[in-house]
Swiss-Prot record:
Family: Belongs to the universal ribosomal protein uS7 family.
One GO-annotated biological process of the protein: translation
Protein name: Small ribosomal subunit protein uS7
Single GO cellular component term: small ribosomal subunit
NCBIfam families assigned: rpsG_bact (TIGR01029)
Record function comment: One of the primary rRNA binding proteins, it binds directly to 16S rRNA where it nucleates assembly of the head domain of the 30S subunit. Is located at the subunit interface close to the decoding center, probably blocks exit of the E-site tRNA.
Subunit details: Part of the 30S ribosomal subunit. Contacts proteins S9 and S11.
Length: 157
C-alpha cells in the first residue's frame, strides 16, 4: 500500500434549486461529458413530473425514499482461497451504498422505453419508492447472491 497521506474527499456543493447535497451528487452521476446543465434539466424535469403526478407530495422526499430503497446492505466480493474463487458476502460501506444506488438508478432509467430521459428517470424513481423497477431488481439480485453465498462469509477480508 502507498505510504502517502489519504486524499481528502472533495466537498460537493448543494444543488441550486433544492439545496440538497445528495441531489447534487446524483446530478454528477447523470452528467456526461461535463454537461451539467443538461443533467440539471433532466433531474429537475423528472422531479417536476413527479410533482405533477403526485400533487402535494414533495418530489425531493420521493427521491430520497427511492434512493433509500435501492441502497444495498450486502454485496459479494471474489476471494481466492487455495486455488478456488469464492464469492464472499461483505457489508457495503455507507458511501459506496449511496454510489451504487445512484449508479443503478441511472442505468435502470437508461434502459427504460419512455421518450425522454427525465420521463424515464421520473418513472423509475416512482417505481423505486413503491419497491419495484429495474434498480430494485438489481438490488434484490445482489442481495440474493449474498444470501446464496452466506456459507463463505467466514472468508472475511
Amino acid at each position: 500500500m502507498p505510504r502517502r497521506r489519504e486524499v481528502p474527499k472533495r466537498e460537493i456543493l448543494p444543488d441550486p434549486k433544492f439545496g440538497d447535497v445528495d441531489l447534487a451528487k446524483f446530478m454528477n452521476v447523470i452528467m456526461q461529458g461535463g454537461k451539467k446543465a443538461v443533467a440539471e434539466r433532466i433531474i429537475y424535469g423528472a422531479l417536476d413530473f413527479i410533482e405533477k403526478k403526485n400533487p402535494g407530495k414533495d418530489p425531493l422526499e420521493a427521491f430520497h425514499m427511492a434512493i433509500g430503497n435501492i441502497k444495498p446492505m450486502v454485496e459479494v466480493k471474489s476471494r481466492r482461497v487455495g486455488g478456488a474463487n469464492y464469492q464472499v458476502p461483505v457489508e457495503v460501506r455507507p458511501v459506496r451504498r449511496m454510489a451504487l444506488a445512484m449508479r443503478w438508478l441511472k442505468e435502470a432509467a437508461k434502459k427504460r422505453g419512455e421518450k425522454s430521459m427525465s420521463l424515464r428517470l421520473a418513472n423509475e424513481l416512482m417505481e423505486a419508492t413503491e419497491g419495484r423497477g429495474g434498480a430494485m431488481k438489481k438490488r434484490d439480485e445482489v442481495h440474493r447472491m449474498a444470501e446464496a453465498n452466506k456459507a463463505f462469509s467466514h472468508f472475511r477480508f
